[in-house]
Amino acid sequence: MWFFARDPVRDFPFELNPEPPEGGPPGPWVLHRGRKKATGSAVSIFVYDVKPGAEEQTQVAKAAFKRLKTLRHPNILAYIDGLETEKCLHIVTEAVTPLGTYLKARAEAGGLKEQELSWGLHQIVKALSFLVNDCNLIHNNVCMAAVFVDKAGEWKLGGLDYMYSAQGNGGGPPNKGIPELEQYDPPELADSSSRAVKEKWSADMWRLGCLIWEVFNGSLPRATALRNPGKIPKSLVTHYCELVGANPKVRPNPARFLQNCRAPGGFMSNRFVETNLFLEEIQIKEPAEKQKFFQELSKSLDSFPEDFCRHKVLPQLLTAFEFGNAGAVVLTPLFKVGKFLSAEEYQQKIIPVVVKMFSSTDRAMRVRLLQQMEQFIQYLDEPTVNTQIFPHVTHGFLDTNPAIREQTVKSMLLLAPKLSETNLNVELLKHFARLQAKDDQGPIRCNTTVCLGKIGSYLSASTRHRVLTSAFSRATKDPFAPSRVAGVLGFAATHNLYSMDDCAHKILPVLCGLTVDPEKSVRDQAFKTIRSFLSKLESVSEDPTQLAEIEKDVHAASSPGTGGAAASWAGWAVTGVSSLTSKLIRTHPTPVPSEAAVPQRPVPEGDPAPAPAPASATPATSGHRETQEEDKDAAEDSATADRWDDEDWGSLEQEAESVLAQQDDWSTKGQGNRAGQVSHSDHKSLDSHWSSWEVEGSWDQGWQEPSSVEPPPEGTRLASEYNWGGAEPSDKGDPFAALSVRPSTQPRPDPDSWGEDNWEGLEAESRQVKAELARKKREERRREMEAKRAEKKATKGPMKLGARKLD
């Protein structure tokens, strides 16, 4: 029934590649590359074909098959599967390359570093120590041909064909019969009459010396060449000479050889070896030791081999995060190693971990992720961003830690191109509205405006029309000077998104109000922006046919490609905002925008004007000092231009307490003295007045000037609440009620929404409601007091204590 027989080679779950076999070690085995049929993973397959009349070689091959199958050690070639038939033997191992082939390929690419060679030899000596000291086995075949290298650059000891027991069980060493291998035998084996006392490891340590010579000098031509160390490093020569000494008694045990080489200043005493040893024992290390190791690992990765980082360090980092609770310290080395991966490998190994990290509640990890988002954002697809990352990132907008809130705002610059229409035009802008209106940190309000200016091109046309003008108008009324500058620059950066009607009726009136701003930097930018808008209007006035061309982007769909114009603005503007506002936080805290302290509000006619606060005295010699510091700050701002991601955003968290501690002093003075220094950024050329807008003067300039006016009295309506375009009067008691922006019948808007009206209406309306309630209470109190006084007057005659005379 021969047709029922099955070919075991055909059913073997591994197959040999059709490529020519690699140059394997001298001996019975031929090394092939192969793969697993089920998964396609790469393996190495050692093949021995049984030949008639070669029974001795067949027995050697079968012994090697048995030894490799039963021996398990990290530094010995890893056995995966095997096949034994009457015609052949197959041994499947991890994918490896012969050491000779590996060294030749690396030499062509620039050669191996000494630290790589030290770790490779460390592994081979450790494998010999395991065989001799733990298993009582003599390898009997240590040479270049018996060493293999895996994909991580790890050296593995193979060539177990001629291994025998050190205790004498099963006879002596087998006969090799191969001249290429016999040249590595120690001299005492050639002299049969020699009675020199030797240790069980003496022969293998001699062969180890031959291996060391070959690693540094190439193939060993003859045994006498061992007398010349050649290129062997000086730190290893002393220990090498002990290995190739004629007296077998003085050859050290493999364990002692390792100890000698690991001594301070020794050949195997370096950062690379220490890192590998720690990774081998990382599972039994204490959490504090792991934290320290990962913190220091990032500094060393640049000097480590790329294959080692990809195939050994990366799996340990992923395991440490997945099961070891390593936390945020893993992120820096993880992203550093990720640079060595292809796009496909990054998607398979890094992205799943990153997505899981975003759901973490660890603040340190969230900040690190936001800070390093630029390194992995390109590998994230839109569905992953919208469903698994953005919902977790938005929690940062509501975090009590200012540093996390600001980093979250910053990350939107990278996430915006990948966000869906709903997440971008609704969810994100809802958070931006809350931050710009209510956040107590001036720099966060400022950078929210900056971020909105850059992502404006990604918004839909209807959202742009509804949001941008209101948002930037609100920013121009912020008590924090850099926020006002950001609002002006926001108008400039998004100039192509406004119709001519909006420019004339909405934007220019807002900008004109800033021409009398106390801060010179705000005034300067306002004048430049006004001139640009006026030149645009003038060109349309002279040639109305240009209107369609100028307004071509107003109703266009969101176009990420147009973000380049805003990118130049955001690049330097964000740098200026982050650097200068961080200085402000450290030295001059800003007040929280509140109902009681809103600077630069017009006082209604008829109310008494508050007395101006005295300006702080300035020494006569301060002008020269400020000029020098201006030049210094200008150099710093120029050097740090376009480095949004390099800014120290964490400074907000460090200085939050000082900001809050000094707010009470601001509120009690009513009009805070502003003191600061002037810093100028580099002047940049204007491309048709729109490509970029340099900041002339620091945002902390002008704190020496007093606030213009005090807050208006309670119940007073603000000028911003009147519609100066004219409307029918609805309240006879208020002569300006006819000019109100909102009819009284309209409901109040959601404070987190981006309504059609200007953003300042949110705060003004809140103050209006409170003022109305206070007025009603005062009116009720007045009527009660009048009733009591009338009752007292109605009583007649003198009154006694505790009684009243009856009529």
From Swiss-Prot:
Q: Which domain of life is it from?
A: Eukaryota
* Acidic residues bias locations: 644-656, 753-763
- Region (Disordered) residue ranges read 587-807
Predominant location = cytoplasm
Composition bias (Basic and acidic residues) maps to: 764-774, 781-794
Composition-biased stretches, type Pro residues, lie in 601-613
The family annotation for this protein states: Belongs to the protein kinase superfamily.
Protein name per Swiss-Prot or TrEMBL: N-terminal kinase-like protein
This protein's encoding gene: Scyl1
